[in-house]
Amino acid sequence: MMRTEYTTITPHGGTLVDRRVPVGEREERRQRAAELPRIVLGPRNLSDLEMIGTGVFSPLTGFMGREDYESVVEEMRLADGLPWSIPITLSVSEEEARSFEEGDEVALANGEGEIVATMVVEDRYTYDRAHEAKLVYRTTDTDHPGVAALFRQGDVLVGGEVSLLDDGTTTRPFPRYYYEPRELRAIFRQKGWRRVVGFQTRNPVHRAHEYIQKSALETVDGLLLNPLVGETKSDDIPAHVRMRSYEVLLERYYPRDRTVLAVFPAAMRYAGPREAVFHAICRKNYGCTHFIVGRDHAGVGNYYGTYDAHRIFDEFEPGELGITPLFFEHAFFCLNCGGMATTKTCPHDKDSHVFFSGTRVREMLRNGEYPPPEFSRPEVIEVLISGLRQQEG
């Protein structure tokens, strides 16, 4: 079994991928790419492209071909057997697919028509959306945002290795907090951290999150607070508002020498248990040795059981993922204990427990209501309400 506690963790698959073309070669490659068939990428595919290119999705070197796709959907493994739980695919229409052959090189462009990468087409194949939805999202209900996105995709998937011509350095969100995997790994080494726990969130950090993070921090050297700032649901708190709330919280309530705030610029899939495994693998590539998995991780609505995201890790052999999941129950504020707790540490009945869901708190914030201090630090609430007022104004 891999002892991640005492080693510099190896990237998933053994090598940290870098698919960026050297700067000196980019202009020539762009000019050549201008003559190629072109595929325009939406926000999610652009995000995936960036994650592939910088190594966050190691060992992927491009969008998945048929063998990897089918293996991931059916078995949560790449074709070579390596654990991987979410399909990373590029879809096109049937008409677009007829404009190139397997073996051709195509240009990948953003919404403004700028060529950002090229791809050598290794595979073109059709797929069963409903089958993917059932296995990956556990539902075919198009009210589920991940399923809805899947059913909006083109009819043909295109797989192949990518070469980035634009690594996004001039357009990256929150550049102060943007770190590539190799950069975060260097920071962890510089700080002397051998055991690093990662925490994923798309919500403001509330007292339950703070309790979980600090409980984990008691057992490791450092905490990576790694909020997702890619594509999310329309009713999620905007990333710029959340980021300010994280800054305030870390400045006032966390040890600065044991925490790092860095954005995770991936798109949210809302795939629940499967996405929990996927998020753990991504944090392994960033250099984390441990990853926090809370209640209904990456869930939405009532599609997943409260602790399904814990149980899915049992489907892998101990040490096989190469990162240690830390499972936490739903934390609450106990009026009798006078602090945060879980059912593992609190003897009192539910009448004394104060629970707040992210959905309920978002509603309160948008209505200008102040959630009680049992939910979140007052400074954080001020930032959130102020930010939402400015957005709506």
Curated annotation (Swiss-Prot):
Any one GO MF annotation of this record: sulfate adenylyltransferase (ATP) activity
UniProt-listed Pfam families: ATP-sulfurylase (PF01747), PUA_2 (PF14306)
Single biological process term from Gene Ontology: hydrogen sulfide biosynthetic process
Reactions that this protein is recorded to catalyse: sulfate + ATP + H(+) = adenosine 5'-phosphosulfate + diphosphate
CDD domains: ATPS (cd00517)
EC number(s) recorded for this UniProt protein: 2.7.7.4
Domain of life (superkingdom): Bacteria
InterPro entries, A to Z: ATP-Sase_PUA-like_dom, PUA-like_sf, Rossmann-like_a/b/a_fold, SO4_adenylyltransferase_pro, Sulfurylase_cat_dom, Sulphate_adenylyltransferase
Span of the signal peptide: none
Keywords noted in UniProt: ATP-binding, Nucleotide-binding, Nucleotidyltransferase, Transferase
Pathway: Sulfur metabolism; hydrogen sulfide biosynthesis; sulfite from sulfate: step 1/3
Family: Belongs to the sulfate adenylyltransferase family.
HAMAP family per UniProt: Sulf_adenylyltr
Name of the molecule in the record: Sulfate adenylyltransferase
Natural source organism: Rubrobacter xylanophilus (strain DSM 9941 / JCM 11954 / NBRC 16129 / PRD-1)
